Regions:
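Charged helix-capping and loop-helix junction motifs
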Residues: 34-38, 123, 204-208
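Active-site metal-binding motif and surrounding structural segment of the metallo-beta-lactamase
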Residues: 1-52, 153-170, 183-188
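Short, solvent-exposed loop/turn and secondary-structure capping segments
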Residues: 30-34, 62-64, 141, 175-176
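Core dinuclear metal-dependent hydrolase active-site scaffold
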Residues: 1-15, 83-162, 234-279
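Active-site metal-binding loops of divalent metal-dependent hydrolases
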Residues: 1, 22-24, 55, 112, ...
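Divalent cation-coordinating acidic motifs and surrounding scaffolds
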Residues: 20-22, 28, 53-65, 76, ...
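Internal alpha/beta domain cores that form substrate/cofactor-binding pockets in large enzymes
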Residues: 58-63, 69, 73-80, 151, ...
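Hydrophobic/aromatic beta-strand patches that form the interior of the parallel beta-sheet core
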Residues: 20, 49-51, 83-86, 107-109, ...
Length: 279
């Protein structure tokens, strides 16, 4: 419901020309499926082109429901479905590059786990680059170190205005080899900052110390969606909130529903990340 309501603010005709599911982990496909109480993206909108992952090791009920809803959308309308590998190969009607508007293109990138077996589901992530004139915006899903290495080797990556941080700011993503190539000016992280859901080690809660140490060498314009809170409903509250990166083709602007100050100026960052170094 949260996702469909947010998208509806901008998609006023009920049609999404392109939707991308990066990989089959729950937090990346649940919004497409929906629940008994609320429609997911595949049912709430007409999705003209669905592009997703070429491989997965998942066999969960959620993944099966994702496939069911995706295929139902294709069967019921003029919707087409391709994998990222189809796009890279210009195969089965897919394209490596799609023109979204004059001087704006959606470009699919190659990484070896489109075709090879990965030890971690994250490395099956779809990777793509939005180009708007001379501005570049990179999205890598939850791609991790080995996948990022392949991404750098197999593509001529440009300097990027925006990098949507890999795997929620984990220590296994957004590695030096990739960052040195793209030299990002703005980095956005989708995570609940400071949450101990996965670890009690403060250095490894999202966004991790390793991640911050690597990114700060290129930019202090880091933005993070939410912050852990023991007292807030659901145990989280807005940090930067909804992060909107916009441009008319020249200057790139960041507007947030929460604080407009970069994460690097937050009390949490100054207390737990600034001046500290990963062991």
């Amino acid at each position: 419901k949260t996702i469909t309501e947010y998208v509806s603010r901008y998609c006023t005709d009920g049609v999404l020309e392109y939707v991308i599911a990066t990989h089959a982990d729950q937090d990346h496909i649940a919004g497409f499926v929906g629940t008994s109480a609320a429609k997911g993206i595949f049912e709430a909108f007409e999705c003209r082109t669905i592009i997703d992952f070429a491989r997965t090791s998942k066999d969960t009920q959620l993944y099966k429901k994702y496939v069911e809803k995706r295929d139902a959308a294709v069967a019921a309308s003029e919707t087409v479905h391709y994998t990222a590998l189809d796009c890279w190969n210009n195969a089965n009607g897919a394209q490596r590059s799609y023109e979204l508007a004059p001087d704006i293109t959606l470009n699919f990138l190659y990484q070896k786990f489109y075709e090879e077996e990965a030890k971690d589901e994250n490395n099956y992530s779809v990777c793509f680059l939005l180009k708007q004139g001379n501005n570049n915006y990179l999205f890598t899903g939850d791609l991790e170190k080995e996948g990022e290495k392949s991404l750098v080797e197999k593509n001529d990556l440009p300097q990027c205005k925006l990098f949507k941080a890999g795997h929620h700011g984990s220590k296994t993503s957004s590695n030096d080899e990739l960052l040195a190539k793209i030299r990002p000016e703005i980095v956005c992280v989708c995570c609940c900052c400071g949450s101990t859901e996965y670890t009690n080690d403060i250095a490894n809660v999202f966004p991790t110390q390793d991640f911050c140490d690597r990114v700060i060498k290129y930019t202090d314009k880091i933005y993070v969606t939410t912050m852990y809170s023991e007292t807030a409903e659901g145990n989280f509250e807005s940090l930067n909130g909804n992060i909107i990166v916009s441009s008319n083709g020249g200057e790139v602007k960041v507007t947030c529903s929460g604080s407009n100050e970069p994460f690097t100026k937050s009390e949490w960052y100054l207390k737990y990340r600034a001046g500290n170094k990963a062991a």
